[in-house]
A protein has these predicted regions:
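Conserved GNAT acetyl-CoA-binding A-motif
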Residues: 89-99
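A structural signal for the main folded, soluble domain(s) of proteins
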Residues: 89, 118, 142-145
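Glycine-rich acetyl-CoA-binding "A-motif" of GNAT/NAT acetyltransferases
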Residues: 42-45, 106, 132
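Conserved acetyl-CoA-binding loop-helix of GNAT-fold acetyltransferases
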Residues: 66, 72-86, 105-113
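GNAT-family acyltransferases
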Residues: 1-69, 140-155
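Conserved catalytic-core motifs of GNAT/GCN5-like acyltransferases
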Residues: 97-100, 117-133, 137
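Short, conserved glycine- and acidic-residue-centered signature motifs
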Residues: 54, 76, 80, 131
Length: 155
């Protein structure tokens, strides 16, 4: 998860409910779209476009999976590509960016596979487990996403 350097256990039911409650409140905010990631009828995570700015045609992306047992299955990459497809083809955005803590190598690799490129770092933005971590700033532009997916339409 975002708030720990290692993910060693699944979120408990109470934690998942709190996480959903936080994002349900946020879902009422304008300029935000969220999706529940469903695997065979089970909610396994969520993805968000927020800070959507129609004038500048940009938004910020976030995604989370609740349980490490879902890691490594390609769910994050599939969800990210579908959200980006919606962002660029339906919302007609030009740019989608995100921030990810520098120790989250799996997420960074997923974002790169979806066309995101590193634009910079915000140094020592998060203090966890007695140590400072950087936020890596990444973004993908509409033409970069088209190249990254090889002209294939995600289904």
């Amino acid at each position: 998860g975002y708030g720990s350097t290692t993910v060693t256990r699944a979120m408990g039911d109470d934690e998942v409910e709190q996480w959903y409650a936080h994002w349900e409140l946020a879902a009422d905010e304008p300029n935000r779209i969220h999706w529940v990631l469903d695997l065979e009828g089970e909610a396994v995570g969520a993805a968000f476009l927020h800070a959507i700015n129609a004038e500048d045609r940009r938004a910020r992306y976030a995604i989370g999976l609740y349980d490490p047992s879902f890691f490594g299955r390609g769910l994050g990459q599939q969800a990210t590509r579908l959200v980006l497809q919606h962002a660029f083809e339906t919302l007609m955005l030009h740019r989608v960016d995100l921030r990810v803590l520098d120790f989250n190598h799996r997420a960074i690799a997923t974002y790169r596979a979806c066309g995101f490129v590193e634009e910079g770092r915000e140094r020592e933005t998060c203090f966890l487990d007695g140590r400072w971590y950087d936020d890596v700033v990444m973004a993908v532009l509409e033409h970069e996403f088209a190249v990254a997916r090889g002209g294939r339409r995600e289904t």
